[in-house]
């Protein structure tokens, strides 16, 4: 399923990970178990009639959890290339998983 807006995607993540905390950006104090961090990786611009518009935005998702296996199939399906194990983080005492997602159109950037 393609998500055209950041808010749509975040709402879906919140529904599927209802007992997790989800952050856009984070500080070290936010490192707790069952947490998903969303970080901006890149954005592409296109031009329509000489006017720049946001074509797409790519985000990195970082998941912290107790288990060494990420088994939420619905969340895996929401990513560009699946969810990958990155290792164990002794500071947070969590297993770390990463993924990327690309959202399309001007709504791919969150409203501030």
Regions found by a protein language model. Give the residues of each.
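Small/polar-rich, solvent-exposed N-terminal microdomains that initiate assembly or binding
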Residues: 1-46, 51, 66
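Oligomerization/assembly interface segments of phage tail-like spikes and tubes
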Residues: 54-67, 95-108
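Low-complexity, intrinsically disordered Gly/Pro/Thr-rich segments
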Residues: 80-91
């Amino acid at each position: 399923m393609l998500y055209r807006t950041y808010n749509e995607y975040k709402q879906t993540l919140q529904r599927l990970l209802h007992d997790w905390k989800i952050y856009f950006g984070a500080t070290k104090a936010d490192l707790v178990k069952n947490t998903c961090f969303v970080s901006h990786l890149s954005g592409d611009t296109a031009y329509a009639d000489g006017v720049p518009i946001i074509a797409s935005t790519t985000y990195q998702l970082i998941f912290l959890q107790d288990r060494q296996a990420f088994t939420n199939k619905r969340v895996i399906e929401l990513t560009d290339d699946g969810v990958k194990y990155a290792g164990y983080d002794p500071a947070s005492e969590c297993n770390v998983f990463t993924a990327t997602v690309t959202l399309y159109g001007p709504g791919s950037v969150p409203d501030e």
